[in-house]
């Protein structure tokens, strides 16, 4: 469940497996028609095979057996990737119709266009890129989303600000220089989608364009939904969200053990559904408060006045929100 069928003037259609097949303006009825029509074609394994744009131009993709994307074809150009485990290492472009006599690895054009991506060890956070023999450092926010890039001389060459869904609010410098959105997402300007390993994410829709392949095991009731709060959660595989500090949260983690404070039994914990406050003042006065997506101030407003002033409670809530 949870698929988006209408978004303002945009309408969406899906196949029997829940994959988005069309997105267009208008109702699709005879007099109204389908304007600015995007079409999506899927492989049997649930991976996106092709996107047909409103201008009729096609974008095609290929993958390896692990779901890692190997190529993106658009017009006369093919973009290819080599991987280092779960992150891309090399990226380069080729002519779509190359000669069998060419050394497809060593043409001058490919050498100049080759990009090397470097990531934090055992993470999806990009820290640097090397292109045309020049190195650039990449700065990220608290979640690992790239925000700025600098050359070896310390000059800012790129910066970007995203909204909560991953849409670009502002971008300066070499636009598109760093294509990564949230952790594990590579944005394709040709389609407006972000490749997220096992699914594609749409910033405009604020959701995935196919259902979670692991269904409710992904811990989100909306099978198309991204994480509930992009300020501290991410989903690098398109399967299940992670805390940016501690990875997967499968079991309940107690931040503030149950104790009596001003005649209230209170406990603060984090589980697979996010941070919670358990508040109990006796029979029929028990509350479970999900504070996912709240600020510390908003979470404190959910409590009685006498508890808001307790420093231990405020500190526990802050730690839970930033877990």
Q: What name fits each language-model region?
A:
Residues 240-323:
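Catalytic toxin/effector domains delivered as secreted proteins or via bacterial secretion systems
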Residues 1-136, 155-157, 163, 171-179:
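Acidic/glycine-rich beta-solenoid
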Residues 14, 42, 52, 63, ...:
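Hydrophobic alpha-helical segments, especially N-terminal targeting/anchoring helices
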Residues 209-211:
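A structural motif specific to WD40 beta-propellers
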Residues 15, 62, 81-84, 99-107, ...:
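Short amphipathic beta-strand/extended segments with alternating polar/hydrophobic composition
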Residues 128, 132-197, 204, 228-233:
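A motif-centric feature for acidic-aromatic and gly/ser/thr-rich catalytic loops and repeats
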Residues 219-222:
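Short, solvent-exposed linear patches
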